[in-house]
Amino acid sequence: MNRSSRRTFLAAGAATAAAGTVGGEASASTYPRLVHHVFFWLKNPNSAEDLDKLIAGLRTLKKIDSVRGIHIGVPASTEARAVVDSSFSASEILFFDDVAGQDAYQEHPIHKQFVADCSHLWERVVVYDAVSV
């Protein structure tokens, strides 16, 4: 086997082995059971300053004890399709162990401060909460 075909063989073998470790369903025991996904539409959607303020406020939420993980993002430049809504300004996904953790988050002083500091920036908020099955 020459060096080039050996590398190809090893790369293919590694890719095959790796494929077994990704793409499967997450078990409820490995990941937090509740996802809190929030979409924000800014009053001034073209204001980079307002977006920066919102993102800075969202980042404070990771300090809350019951938050197991956080993802903050803006619309991706993916293919335009009828099922894709990229009209929002920013989104956050928070991960909790359970509903009690999400309830504690809602009442936490850091969350309340975030709302007090940033609610003037948005005109619309949509929340999707989901539990693992």
Tell me the role of every PLM-derived stretch.
Residues 1-16:
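N-terminal secretory signal peptides and thylakoid transit peptides that target proteins
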Residues 21-49:
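C-terminal segment of N-terminal export signals and the immediately downstream linker at the start
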